[in-house]
Amino acid sequence: MAQFDVYARVGRTKSYVVDLQADLLDQLTLRVVAPMVISSTATVISGLTPLVQFQDNEYILLTYQLAAGPARELQDPVGSLSADQDAIKRALDILFLGF
């Protein structure tokens, strides 16, 4: 389990969550995640919801919909957004710090 890993949501087609929690907190039983949806299904909020490319599609990472869930439910990552970590971190700064 690694920060920025992408996991398919159980029972949902083309719906994913991204693990945003720092790797050094692996001992916790919960992980902080945010949903990622096809870009045509949500509105981009400048800076707050980064656009990312994943599996040949454009997605929006909905950082303002953070949630914590059991780490055991995150099985077998289907990819990673580590290449987009700068945009994701900027979005989280906007969410928590306002800039």
Where are these regions (language model features)?
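Compact nucleic-acid interaction/catalytic patches
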Residues: 3-6, 10-50
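C-terminal terminal-subdomain/extension
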Residues: 54-99
